[in-house]
């Protein structure tokens, strides 16, 4: 996940999940749950800094099944193996703290942390995150003779 404020990233994470997911839905659902925890934490920090945010935090997910799972409070036989703490996202969606929305895979900026991307997509996501690459000569120092 990646959270942005203004034009730059303020929080991001990319971790290997602790257990093997049995489906892409489960993997995305777990990732959304971790992002929801981060969203709640960031809102609390902003509130402590005097910037309360009343609107729900939008979380974008490219898996429709995991969005449906988070919005539906009914437990299904197919989801009983998912560890209970991952259902935290359901509570936050139902409480109105988090708004889980679908986003096209082509626009999923957080993919910069987890996937090999082509140059065009890499530059697009870097721009979206507010990342820049400094001029290489300024990093290495000048190799030109400046004594003349």
Locations of the language-model features?
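Acidic, metal-ligating active-site segments
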Residues: 1-7
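Short, well-ordered secondary-structure "scaffold" segments embedded in the functional core
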Residues: 8-10, 22
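RNase H-like nuclease module associated with reverse transcription
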Residues: 15-148
